[in-house]
């Protein structure tokens, strides 16, 4: 009973390819279980889909969301690694983006979140994207409105995405559109 029931329900949902904790576990059990809540008056986003994951990352580009986590609660720690700071080479342009340690930026990054150890090639444009760990993006490449999964390589001259559709790119390149 209690948390054991929650874990069982969570495992059942995963086998059914359902990952929405709020709808699949909390709301589904509201009439049969005692559920206690805490009124949260700050930022919250239910990450139950790829779109939700993308939106949550993009929300961190808003000063009020970023400030809530990093100014109001400055003791948020992530995994400690001994990485150099991000490097912005001559000709690079970055606006309204979060660039993590170990990244090398040679191109343009706009409205994007770039996780650690990513490489952005010369004359490449990254726009409205989430670039995960250890991604290599070659020269003269455009990545727009995409999530690029960890350890992916985007070859020079490739163009992924457009402003109307969210795409997920993996190690073997294009995975699916949403």
Task: Give the positions of each predicted feature.
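Short, small-residue-biased leader/transition segments that mark boundaries at the very start
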Residues: 2-7
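Left-handed beta-helix
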Residues: 12-178
């Amino acid at each position: 009973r209690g948390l054991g029931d929650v874990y069982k329900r969570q495992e059942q949902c995963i086998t059914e390819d359902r990952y929405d904790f709020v709808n699949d576990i909390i709301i589904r059990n509201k009439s049969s279980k005692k559920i206690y809540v805490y009124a949260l008056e700050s930022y919250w986003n239910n990450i139950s889909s790829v779109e939700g994951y993308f939106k949550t990352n993009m929300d961190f580009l808003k000063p009020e969301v970023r400030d809530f986590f990093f100014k109001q609660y400055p003791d948020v720690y992530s995994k400690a690694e001994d990485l150099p700071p991000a490097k912005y080479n001559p000709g690079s342009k970055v606006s309204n983006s979060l660039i993590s340690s170990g990244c090398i930026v040679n191109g343009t990054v706009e409205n994007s979140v770039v996780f650690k150890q990513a490489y952005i090639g010369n004359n490449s444009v990254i726009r409205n994207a989430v670039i995960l760990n250890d991604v290599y993006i070659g020269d003269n490449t455009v990545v727009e409105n995409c999530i690029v999964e960890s350890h992916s390589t985007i070859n020079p001259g490739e163009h992924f995405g457009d402003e109307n559709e969210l795409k997920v790119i993996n190690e073997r390149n294009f995975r699916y559109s949403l």
